[in-house]
């Protein structure tokens, strides 16, 4: 039972680890990569605003 909290913490940390692309980006991949970067940035901003607004109403904007 002592391993369960450690396993949960490791499970939560694993998605935040940086990912490495196996294939180098080509000219055709650049628009798709920038789209993914924009989507990721937008989701991160929405996630931060959600947690911020839950804790501190002043920081919502």
Swiss-Prot record:
Q: Give the tissue specificity.
A: Expressed by the venom duct.
Q: What processing steps or modifications follow its translation?
A: Contains 2 disulfide bonds that can be either 'C1-C3, C2-C4' or 'C1-C4, C2-C3', since these disulfide connectivities have been observed for conotoxins with cysteine framework V (for examples, see AC P0DQQ7 and AC P81755).
Role: Has the ability to interact with the G-protein coupled somatostatin type 3 receptor (SSTR3). The ability was measured in competition binding experiments and the constant of inhibition (Ki) has been evaluated to be 3.5 uM.
Can you quote the domain comment? The cysteine framework is V (CC-CC).
**Protein's UniProt name:** Conotoxin LiC32
Keyword ATP-binding carried by entry: no
Gene Ontology MF terms in the entry? toxin activity
- List the Pfam families: Chi-conotoxin
Prosegment residue ranges: 23-44
